[in-house]
A protein has these predicted regions:
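A short, Lys/Arg-rich alpha-helix, primarily the initiator
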Residues: 1-25
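A generic secondary-structure micro-motif detector
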Residues: 9, 47-48
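Helix-turn-helix DNA-binding elements, focusing on the entry/boundary residues of the two helices
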Residues: 19, 30, 41, 55-58
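Alpha-helical residues within the helix-turn-helix
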Residues: 24, 35, 63
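Short alpha-helical DNA-recognition segment
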Residues: 27-45
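Short, basic-rich loop-to-helix N-cap that marks the start of a DNA-contacting helix
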Residues: 50-63
Length: 66
């Protein structure tokens, strides 16, 4: 059972990977997603690389991609 436990940063990176895949599937650049979502380009890049993002920004991105 302990093998199933994951750390928050691992989950965050997985979410970032999923959102990046959605962005690419929709053929959006980071700049386009930034403009459509209202999330700064720097924040979006950091999110895709590290998984770090505010909850509000994550919701904004999800609203564009989902």
């Amino acid at each position: 059972m302990l093998e199933q436990l994951r750390f928050p940063h691992e989950i965050a990176k997985d979410i970032a990977k999923q959102e990046k895949n959605k962005r690419k599937k929709r053929k959006l650049t980071q700049a386009e997603l930034s403009a459509r979502s209202g999330v700064s380009l720097a924040s979006l890049k950091r999110f895709e690389q590290t998984g770090e993002i505010s909850f509000v920004s994550l919701v904004k991105i999800a609203m564009v991609l989902d």
